[in-house]
């Protein structure tokens, strides 16, 4: 009925979702994100975050109010400032990441980021075997650390 539709629209006015996506091309990948879902670039030499979160704590880190380590434990770490659906004009950020053979890109939600350290991600991906096994290990670590949020991850490697 019309009344039910109006209630659904009203009740979902503050709902939104985060996004991180990548498209591979010959020499690398194009990545986009909105919210606090992230992309990481991983090689045997290390792990680098590609994306920036659209969140209260990321702004606090940028302004020097807290450190990146403090942001991981901050009670407001899940307060995002941009999301798809909530704001019809929400802008996604874009990145171009050149890649060499054997390099990885990890796309993941905050459920993984909040429970698995960058060094754990690096170790599991570089030493974990095939891509499916790496992801299984990361999800196992996240769940064993009490992941309170949903945990989603995608791993790609340049061949």
Question: Where are the language model's segments positioned?
Answer:
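Single conserved hydrophobic/aromatic residue that forms the stacking wall/gate
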Residues: 1-9
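Short beta-strand scaffold segments in enzyme catalytic cores
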Residues: 17-23, 29-33, 38-42, 151-157
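Predominantly a core beta-strand signature of beta-propeller blades
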Residues: 46-47
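C-terminal catalytic subdomain
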Residues: 82-108, 112-159
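Glycine/charge-rich, flexible interdomain linkers and switch-proximal surface loops
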Residues: 10-20, 96
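A secondary-structure boundary/capping signal
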Residues: 33-35, 53, 108-109, 117
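Conserved, helical-rich catalytic subdomain that frames metal- and/or nucleotide-binding sites
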Residues: 52-101
């Amino acid at each position: 009925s019309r009344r039910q539709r109006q209630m659904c629209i009203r009740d979902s006015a503050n709902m939104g979702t985060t996004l991180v996506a990548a498209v591979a091309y010959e020499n690398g990948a194009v990545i986009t994100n909105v919210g606090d879902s992230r992309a990481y670039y991983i090689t045997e030499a290390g792990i680098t975050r590609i994306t920036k979160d659209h969140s209260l704590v990321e702004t606090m880190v940028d302004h020097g109010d807290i450190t990146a380590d403090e942001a991981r434990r901050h009670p407001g770490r899940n307060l995002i400032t941009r999301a798809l659906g909530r704001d019809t004009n929400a802008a996604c950020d874009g990145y171009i990441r050149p890649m060499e053979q054997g390099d990885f890109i990890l796309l993941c939600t905050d459920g993984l980021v909040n429970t698995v350290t960058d060094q754990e991600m690096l170790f599991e991906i570089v030493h974990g075997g095939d891509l499916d096994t790496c992801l299984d290990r990361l999800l196992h670590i996240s769940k064993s650390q009490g992941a309170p949020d949903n945990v989603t991850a995608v791993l790609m490697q340049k061949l």
